[in-house]
Amino acid sequence: MPLSTSLLGKKSTYKDSYDATLLFKIPRINNRNVLGINNNLPFYGVDIWNTYEISCLNKNGKPLVGIGTFYIPADSENIVESKSFKLYLNSFNNFIVKSIEELEQIILQDLSNVTCAKVTGRIFPINTKIEFGIPSGKNIDNLDIVCNNYGPPDNSLIEYEDVLVEEEIHSNLLKSNCLVTGQPDWGTIVIKYKGKKLKYDSFLRYLISFRNCNEFAEQCAERIFIDIKNAINLDFLSIYIVYTRRGGIDICPYRSTDKSYALPSNKRFIRQ
């Protein structure tokens, strides 16, 4: 189905009964073609979806609530349009289950069906202790730079020094807009790499050039990955973007050149 038929940016009615057909799939290939990515993916990874509006009823009609974390593989055929996922989750509000674990399995199966991949994850009780994380690596945001490009993203700004390093850097200045609604997506990006050293000032300008860019979170992550990879011959590269919550959901893409990558800790940063 074309993206124009999705519910993004449109007035919606919340259904009062469970409906898996609310999930709207978007083929990844649509946006990857723009980036020159074919089926031979240049990365491995996952999209981490944290969902804060999950509720259903137990057998006595009493509400249950939880926080969900779901992992959609980067090699899935489709992604899920975020507003459709929000409407889908809210269709469980009057749905009776034996346990929250039953709800968890239903959601995992539905997500696996629509993405054509094995989706994993779980629903946590809301009294689970949460520890805020701090972005790892060197923060590059305090550089005194002049910026005048806020879109489209300019990969010519990615420059490097003729010195080999293995390091981790991060920035809290990433901002783009939803492809359909134009609503802002605010993110913290963590980059780990091994190879020629990125020039921090020019790279920060590159990140800031996404400011008025209209793309989905997953596409922004993959564009940054591809742009770095094409600019510098690296032995290793991973990027992890933690986006702030919108509509009760935050999406955190992770991409890596390492097939045996370790999942990010998924600790919330302060803006989540």
UniProtKB/Swiss-Prot annotation:
<comment type="similarity">
    <text>Belongs to the GTP cyclohydrolase I family. QueF type 2 subfamily.</text>
</comment>
<feature type="active site" description="Thioimide intermediate">
    <location>
        <position position="178"/>
    </location>
</feature>
<comment type="pathway">
    <text>tRNA modification; tRNA-queuosine biosynthesis.</text>
</comment>
<dbReference type="GO" id="GO:0005737">
    <property type="term" value="C:cytoplasm"/>
</dbReference>
<keyword id="KW-0671">Queuosine biosynthesis</keyword>
<dbReference type="GO" id="GO:0033739">
    <property type="term" value="F:preQ1 synthase activity"/>
</dbReference>
<feature type="binding site">
    <location>
        <begin position="82"/>
        <end position="83"/>
    </location>
    <ligand>
        <name>NADPH</name>
    </ligand>
</feature>
<dbReference type="GO" id="GO:0008616">
    <property type="term" value="P:queuosine biosynthetic process"/>
</dbReference>
<feature type="active site" description="Proton donor">
    <location>
        <position position="185"/>
    </location>
</feature>
<protein>
    <recommendedName>
        <fullName>NADPH-dependent 7-cyano-7-deazaguanine reductase</fullName>
        <ecNumber>1.7.1.13</ecNumber>
    </recommendedName>
</protein>
<dbReference type="Pfam" id="PF14819">
    <property type="entry name" value="QueF_N"/>
</dbReference>
<keyword id="KW-0560">Oxidoreductase</keyword>
<keyword id="KW-0963">Cytoplasm</keyword>
<dbReference type="InterPro" id="IPR029139">
    <property type="entry name" value="QueF_N"/>
</dbReference>
<dbReference type="InterPro" id="IPR029500">
    <property type="entry name" value="QueF"/>
</dbReference>
<comment type="function">
    <text>Catalyzes the NADPH-dependent reduction of 7-cyano-7-deazaguanine (preQ0) to 7-aminomethyl-7-deazaguanine (preQ1).</text>
</comment>
<feature type="binding site">
    <location>
        <begin position="246"/>
        <end position="247"/>
    </location>
    <ligand>
        <name>NADPH</name>
    </ligand>
</feature>
<feature type="binding site">
    <location>
        <begin position="80"/>
        <end position="82"/>
    </location>
    <ligand>
        <name>substrate</name>
    </ligand>
</feature>
<dbReference type="InterPro" id="IPR050084">
    <property type="entry name" value="NADPH_dep_7-cyano-7-deazaG_red"/>
</dbReference>
<dbReference type="InterPro" id="IPR043133">
    <property type="entry name" value="GTP-CH-I_C/QueF"/>
</dbReference>
<keyword id="KW-0521">NADP</keyword>
<comment type="subunit">
    <text>Homodimer.</text>
</comment>
<dbReference type="InterPro" id="IPR016428">
    <property type="entry name" value="QueF_type2"/>
</dbReference>
<feature type="binding site">
    <location>
        <begin position="217"/>
        <end position="218"/>
    </location>
    <ligand>
        <name>substrate</name>
    </ligand>
</feature>
<dbReference type="Pfam" id="PF14489">
    <property type="entry name" value="QueF"/>
</dbReference>
<dbReference type="GO" id="GO:0006400">
    <property type="term" value="P:tRNA modification"/>
</dbReference>
